[in-house]
């Protein structure tokens, strides 16, 4: 088990590498805990860093629990402002819920000054989410220049289902990163996720590598 307060750190050139390292890390170092939605193995603190080498870095692993249709549907939802029958979606929270399109504002901010540290979007609404059951896992994201023409994306999760969601999440975040980079005249580079609680549900363990 990791030391108290010490995060698990994984890095790779592909989402598959990051996913396998994160799952293995949680299996080895995770603690068994009973949570609201069932027993999990978890680490409290995960940093997952991806340095993609090309489009193939985002190929879906053959043994990933979700099929390609599910991954692409999630990817589309991240930029779609419509709720489409859900209690919340990330696209709605990012682009409509707070009365403004945060993605467009980020593009504008980076276009005005690509060295800004204020290109931040949030999904968490404390007025609602502290009392609800269905709440965002992704709570905030920040896009920032790498000091040149590259654009990094940093995402913050309160809770992250590494077993089933990591690959789909990172693919969708990359699409958002590309969307912003293209409109701001930058090139998407690295993608880093910080999760306060990263876990695998015990019922999913037999189906994971």
From Swiss-Prot:
Q: What CDD domains has UniProt attached to this entry?
A: TS_Pyrimidine_HMase
Which Gene3D superfamilies has this protein been placed in? Answer: Thymidylate synthase/dCMP hydroxymethylase domain
Provide a GO biological process annotation.
methylation
Task: Tell me which EC number(s) this protein carries.
Answer: 2.1.1.-
Keyword Cell membrane on this protein?
A: no
Per the record, its GO cellular-component terms are: cytosol
Q: What is its main location?
A: cytoplasm
Keyword Cytoplasm in the entry? The reply is: yes
Kindly name one Pfam family recorded for this protein: Thymidylat_synt
* Assigned keywords, A-Z: Cytoplasm, Methyltransferase, Nucleotide biosynthesis, Transferase
Active site: residue positions:
137
> In what pathway does it function?
Pyrimidine metabolism; dTTP biosynthesis
Subcellular location(s) of the protein: Cytoplasm
Broad enzyme group = transferase
Q: State whether it acts alone or in a complex, and with which partners, per the record.
A: Monomer.
* HAMAP family hit by this protein: Thymidy_synth_arch (MF_01686)
Under the heading PANTHER family, the entry gives: THYMIDYLATE SYNTHASE 1
Give the family per the record: Belongs to the thymidylate synthase family. Archaeal-type ThyA subfamily.
Function according to Swiss-Prot or TrEMBL? May catalyze the biosynthesis of dTMP using an unknown cosubstrate.
Per its record, how is this protein called by name? Putative thymidylate synthase
Organism of this sequence: Methanopyrus kandleri (strain AV19 / DSM 6324 / JCM 9639 / NBRC 100938)
């Amino acid at each position: 088990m990791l030391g108290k307060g010490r995060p698990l750190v994984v890095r790779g050139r592909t989402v598959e590498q990051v996913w396998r390292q994160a799952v293995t890390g949680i299996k080895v170092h995770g603690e068994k805990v009973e949570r609201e939605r069932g027993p999990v193995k978890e680490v409290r603190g995960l940093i997952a860093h991806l340095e993609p080498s090309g489009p193939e870095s985002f190929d879906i692993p053959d043994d990933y629990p979700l099929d390609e249709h599910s991954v692409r549907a999630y990817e589309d939802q991240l930029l779609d402002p419509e709720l489409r029958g859900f209690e919340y979606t990330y696209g709605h929270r990012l682009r409509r819920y707070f009365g403004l399109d945060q993605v467009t504002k980020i593009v504008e901010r980076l276009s005005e000054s690509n060295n800004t540290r204020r290109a931040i979007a949030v999904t968490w609404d404390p007025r609602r989410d502290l009392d609800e059951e269905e709440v965002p896992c992704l709570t905030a994201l920040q896009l920032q220049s790498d000091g040149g023409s590259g654009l990094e994306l940093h995402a913050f999760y309160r809770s992250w289902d590494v077993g089933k969601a990591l690959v789909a999440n990172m693919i969708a975040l990359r699409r958002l990163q590309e969307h912003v980079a293209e409109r701001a005249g930058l090139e998407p580079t690295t993608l880093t996720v910080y999760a306060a609680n990263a876990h695998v549900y015990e019922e999913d363990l037999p189906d994971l590598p």
